[in-house]
Regions:
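Alpha-helical membrane segments and immediately flanking helix-loop junctions
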Residues: 135-194, 320-405
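Hydrophobic core segments of alpha-helical transmembrane domains in multi-pass membrane transport
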Residues: 10-20, 35-47, 105-114, 183-191, ...
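Transmembrane helical segments that form the transport core of multi-pass membrane transport proteins
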Residues: 253-344
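Long, contiguous bundles of hydrophobic transmembrane helices that form the permeation core
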Residues: 207-258
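Interfacial/capping segments of alpha-helical transmembrane domains
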Residues: 45-81, 230, 276-301, 314-322
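Hydrophobic alpha-helical hairpins/lids featuring a short glycine-rich hinge
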Residues: 68-138
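Structural signature of hydrophobic alpha-helical transmembrane segments
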Residues: 1-11, 100, 292-293, 356-365
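Juxtamembrane inter-helical linkers in multi-pass membrane proteins
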Residues: 126-160, 226-247, 292-298, 322, ...
Length: 406
């Protein structure tokens, strides 16, 4: 019965994606079928093949270690605002967006610029880009972006595609945005595991997001034009840097533009969502529902979908509410709310814990639209209107990808 319900849930998710498609006749059944089978196969390997799980876990730890070096630069500028003392200064609110996330964007962008300069990024694109290119019938740049989401998040993807963004067609751009939203960065995985979320679920969900992001990008936005992206004479900037130092400096300045764009738009989006919640709560108060909010509405709306995915009806409202928190706020807050249910002696079944853990594992939320618009617009202002148009549909597609992994 549970298996049948899960199969029905998969069909429902695919049907929703089909309804969102802008060109239903151009959907490639080969790409969709191969991506779906690959998503299922990766889930099985990660959960039941220990060497595969160990390899990805070590890679995630390595990325986390590299990302941690950005704290050295941040600490030099911000002093004790960054580091272990953050918990003391901010009464436990250690995850400070301005002092952790934004400096990391600058550091990673500078590092990527260096990797382009010495030729490493070109080599990675050719190798990683070929992995899924033929199997899924997609372009090399789409495959490369999808694979790198295991290690880097949506904040860093604009830096990766900067040399190509003006040549990427609309479908490739949509796939890049969707892949970023459907995944979580390897560095974030460690933090969520620290909240009690089983690391094997996080690792499996992270890898399943590669074909999942492609699957749910290619149904709403099928490929209708050939790729114009080439990989000769790769350079991170319009004028190729002449030295190691120039490459790092130009990358850092680009990172600053991306960080500023992300911070500006995210502030606006979070404030707008708070305003919407205030309006909903105010109206709800007239009818005795003063605590009504976007996430609570999503909780009720998504409860039936959670049940179809395999959650018992008694826990469906909780699952829907957590997914609603992820959509309306972010996955960090949702996992924080989920954490008490993961403690020893919890009331949730193992199956329910697994489904919720997978469903929350991704950056797909309304704030991410702001991140995407701000970051991509910073590196390609002329494509900003197009990126803004794709944001909401990419959010829907990435959310469906997360739910399919569950």
């Amino acid at each position: 019965m549970d298996i049948m319900r899960s199969v029905v849930g998969m069909v429902v998710l695919l049907a929703i994606a089909f309804l969102l498609s802008v060109n239903k006749k151009s959907i490639s059944l080969r790409t969709v079928g191969a991506a779906l089978l690959l998503q299922i196969a990766i889930g099985g390997i990660m959960l039941y093949f220990p060497p595969g799980k160990w390899a990805v876990e070590q890679a995630a730890l390595g990325v986390h270690k590299v990302m941690s070096y950005s704290d050295a630069g941040s600490a030099f500028i911000f002093g004790s605002l960054v580091g272990p003392k953050m918990d003391v200064l901010f009464d436990g609110a250690g995850f400070i967006f301005a002092f952790r996330v934004l400096p990391a964007i600058i550091f990673v962008t500078a590092l990527i610029s260096l990797l382009y300069y010495i030729g490493v990024m070109g080599l990675l694109i050719r190798i990683l880009g070929s992995i899924f290119q033929k199997a899924l019938n997609i372009s090399k740049i789409e495959s490369f972006v999808a694979v790198t989401t295991i290690f880097l998040g949506q904040n860093e993807i604009p830096a990766i595609v900067k040399p190509f963004i003006d040549r990427m067609n609309r479908n490739e751009l949509f796939t890049a945005i969707c892949s970023g939203m459907a995944s979580i960065a390897g560095s974030m995985m460690i933090g969520y595991a620290g909240m009690g979320v089983p690391i094997d679920y996080l690792l499996a969900a992270s890898l399943m997001a590669i074909p999942g992001g492609i699957l749910f990008a290619r149904i709403p936005s099928p490929a209708t034009e050939p790729s114009q992206v080439t990989f000769e004479n790769l350079s991170f900037s319009e004028t190729p840097p002449k030295s190691f130092i120039e490459a790092a400096a130009s990358g850092a300045m680009t990172g600053l533009k991306i960080a500023a764009g992300v911070a500006t738009v995210v502030m606006a989006f979070v404030a707008i969502i708070a305003l919407i919640n205030g309006i909903i709560g105010g109206i709800g108060g007239w009818f005795g529902f003063a605590n009504a909010s976007l996430e609570s509405i999503f909780g009720y709306v998504l409860a039936p979908l959670a049940w179809i995915m395999g959650v018992d009806w008694s826990d469906a409202n909780l699952a829907g509410s957590l997914i609603g928190q992820k959509l309306a706020i972010n996955e960090f807050v949702a996992y924080l709310s989920f954490s008490p249910y993961l403690q020893t002696g919890g009331t949730l079944e193992v199956k329910t814990i697994a489904i919720i853990s997978f469903a929350l594992c991704g950056f797909a939320n309304f704030g991410s639209i702001g991140v995407v618009v701000g970051a991509f617009s910073a590196i390609s202002p002329k494509r900003a209107p197009e990126i803004a148009q794709l944001g909401l549909r990419a959010l829907a597609a990435a959310t469906l990808s997360n739910l399919m992994s569950a």
